[in-house]
Amino acid sequence: MAKYNTKVLGFGDNVVDLYEHSHMMYPGGNCVNLCAYSKMFGVERAAYMGYFGSDDIAEFVISVLNELEIETVKCKQLVGENGWSKCTLRDGDRIFGDYNEGGVRGKTPYILDRFDLDYMKEVDFVHTGNYCYTESQLKVMKEAGIKISFDFSDDSTEEYYKQIAPDATYAFCSFDGTDEEAEDHLKKITSMGPKLAMASRGAKGCILYDGQEFFAQK
């Protein structure tokens, strides 16, 4: 039974992290992770929408999503490589190496139709990010009344923020700086349109800004 009456949808990236030092692979990607952790926390409904390749890596990700009972009814499977990235551990830190830029997902633009948008309207918000290749569809989603959660990671340029933030309802980023610098960054983000902005800062914890007050993780 669900703990939370919340419905979420991840739209965009699915990848597999290939750990070269251990010869293990793990499913991931911002949107897949959102679905997986939401399901583990007990949301009522978690769905993933995106493109899979036609290789063994794609089948592995699909099998994990099915095992977690995450909806994939709006996904498509295309001929070609699934997204992957190679990584290893060095002094306890994860170091990323080669990656294939999303595989078929990076080569195939999303074009949402009215049925896709109707499906998205069934959830409380749709999560995507700056590695999802979904930028061209954000305005269409916003105009349809869909709440958008967007992860800018730690490498989005100011120009990218100006382009994307106005369409986002909730904005997330990774930020390495002082408390004051983080707060200034979140203020700037919300001034562009999002109702909420949150910065994750590793061991320093997260800071959330709702346009009026700051909330810090202790």
Per-range role (PLM):
Residues 124-188, 203-206:
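Conserved beta-alpha-beta core of the PfkB/ribokinase-like small-molecule kinase fold
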Residues 43-44, 143-147, 192-196:
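A short helix->loop->beta-strand "cap" motif at the edges of active sites that frequently abuts
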Residues 1-23:
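Positively charged, low-complexity intrinsically disordered leader regions
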Residues 24-40:
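Short catalytic helix/loop segments, enriched in acidic residues and glycine
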